[in-house]
């Protein structure tokens, strides 16, 4: 257990260092204070010590900012729309229950209504590999954060390509599950009939 926790502490440090060194502020709308994540490592350690099965302990994630994370504002890239949720969206809660740790909220095309990654007052998210090119959207920040190695995985959404397009343009894996398999409660809707919560990772092996 101690090795796992030390690895998680190192992973948290590495994520924040990667974000700082990349100098790509447009990827993120909000980051948790590093001290909060370090405190959560101790909580994960206590759960492991109590015998909890935490298959995702050691993985660092990000959340597209149209999905609720308790204590972090949800903006959908529209500052005047911002609200502070008191509870995690079920998709986030399930991952936390499995030991995952989230460091912040990522940028997106406003209200998840774009496929280019440029329609945000928080900045146009540039492609991970060629900053002169678009990242794709609307889950632009989540895809680029994963491609740059700032996090192990990230949540996004897909209504009409918002997960698949940035995954393809940034050379990572993007999975759109069967609609209804993952709850969209706590997600700012673009289309209630079509919205899906998606996940990004650099390889399939992560899952």
Task: List PLM regions with ranges.
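Gly/Ser-rich catalytic/binding loops embedded in alpha/beta enzyme cores
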Residues: 1-159
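Fold-level recognition of mixed alpha/beta catalytic cores in primary-metabolism enzymes, strongest
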Residues: 144-207
